[in-house]
Amino acid sequence: MTHSRFLAACRRQPVDATPVWFMRQAGRYMPEYRAIRERYGFLEMVKTPELAAEITMQPIRAFSVDAAIIFADILPLLEGMGLHLTYEQGEGPVIHNPVRSPADVAALRTPDPRETVAYTIQAIRLVKRDLEGRAPLIGFSGAPFTLAAYAIEGGSSRDHRLTKALMYAEPQAWRELMERLTAQVSAYLIAQIEAGADAVQIFDSWAGALAPGDYADYVLPFVQKCIIAVRAGCGIVPPPPIIYFGVGLSGMLGLLRQTDADVIGLDWRIHLDDGWAQVGPGVAVQGNLDPHTLLAPWTEVRRRTADILDRAAGRPGHIFNLGHGIVPETPVDTVRRLAEFVHEYSAE
């Protein structure tokens, strides 16, 4: 793209107004999404490129957001490695043959994601055609640790005790698992960039369950390796921006700086200016309104949004977002007004 507020902010370049997009900006809060969801299962939507492309475009048509993010899911990458994934009503994702031993790790396949998740790669191509340069497109993947946690726990977990048990008791198997996942994530993100993604985000949804020392020892080296591999393998100079986002990592921002991501996503558990000070001046930041704020009256949404923008103080390198994904109960009109307000307030 020749010009984009979002891409400029990722590179800490001056912009005329703060760019804004939202995690889960395509989702259940939108009536257009619900109309499709009534006819198709979740994985069916993810795995049908035409449906995924249409869902990706819905918030671009509805709101003045500065970027699209491909409609996809982080877990189908594990299917290609030999894990059986379903989405159960009321339970969320379930992996029916979880990884619990060194033998399970050794049995994992390492295929080419261009083949195993070809539907997402094709959806990216379709969205790039439909966008016609109106906005950049963000691709994404789960981080190696978060994918490992799902694979080991067999789904979501409150304490990730099975993951930690394998990590502590079988360090060699843990390293092998993380190496395989890092290779898969890197290849997947490179394929997304080759298909047209203008930036990519790495979601480390469960890394906040770890102590800082465990994050530094068992997770950080693989995030670093992944980012290095994507930059080296994408074939673009300069490489597209890489965003790293995790939930519950406000106490580890000094470590996150060491990932060497271009942008660090902040959740809502820290003031934006404090978080930015911890990640350092050489990194852009993304965030960080509590997504549940969007359930409040508009005056409160506006007040809290203005506070975040004031803390950014017009400094190059801020991308406005939520501290997590939009919740299903969010009023559509609040999202519309929020995107407009971010632009208007930051341009003053």
From Swiss-Prot:
Pathway: Porphyrin-containing compound metabolism; protoporphyrin-IX biosynthesis; coproporphyrinogen-III from 5-aminolevulinate: step 4/4. One of its GO terms (molecular function) is uroporphyrinogen decarboxylase activity. Keywords: Cytoplasm, Decarboxylase, Lyase, Porphyrin biosynthesis. It catalyses: uroporphyrinogen III + 4 H(+) = coproporphyrinogen III + 4 CO2. InterPro entries: UROD/MetE-like_sf, Uroporphyrinogen_deCO2ase_HemE, Uroporphyrinogen_deCOase. Substrate binds at R24, Q25, A26, G27, R28, D73, Y150, S205, H324. It comes from the Bacteria. Transmembrane segments: none annotated. Its main location: cytoplasm. Its EC number is 4.1.1.37. One of its GO terms (biological process) is protoporphyrinogen IX biosynthetic process. It is found in: Cytoplasm. Catalyzes the decarboxylation of four acetate groups of uroporphyrinogen-III to yield coproporphyrinogen-III. This is Uroporphyrinogen decarboxylase. It comes from Roseiflexus sp. (strain RS-1). The gene is hemE.
